Amino acid sequence: MIADDQQPEVWVGHIEMDTDQLEASEAFMIALGMRAIFKTDDIAILELRAATHLVLVRKDQIEPSEASFDLMVDDLEAYHGRLTNAGITPSAIEDGRIHNWFTVRDPSGHGITVNSSHSSGLTV
């Protein structure tokens, strides 16, 4: 068992998303607040908190869908406002049972849910 003042031993290393618009998708993720760290003709890698990497993979054709991951922010309302001011069109904020949330669509049409934080307040 991990003590409250210790970091968990594991975290998510990589998540992946296909895109038919690599450059536009990379720019979109940067606008969401991710850090670009590596790019080739076929992939772009962006860094999130805890050193999780989003790997964008160029594909000729994709079927837009809901992302297999979601994002979390400390202040959902402020973040929603920042995205709106940046020209991104998030959905309205919805009240959920555990989180409040909204969605955005990346340039390839994938839906990405952004949740309010549920941090336990313990060391992570």
What are these regions (language model features)?
Residues R35-D41, E94-D95, S119-V124:
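Conserved catalytic-core motifs of GNAT/GCN5-like acyltransferases
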Residues L54-L56, T89-A92:
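A short linear hydrophobic-aromatic micro-motif
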Residues W11-D20, D60-A86, N100-R105:
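Vicinal oxygen chelate
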Residues E9-V10, E16-H53:
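Core segments of cupin and vicinal oxygen chelate
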Residues L46-A51, V104-P107, S117:
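Active-site beta-strand termini and strand-to-loop segments that position acidic
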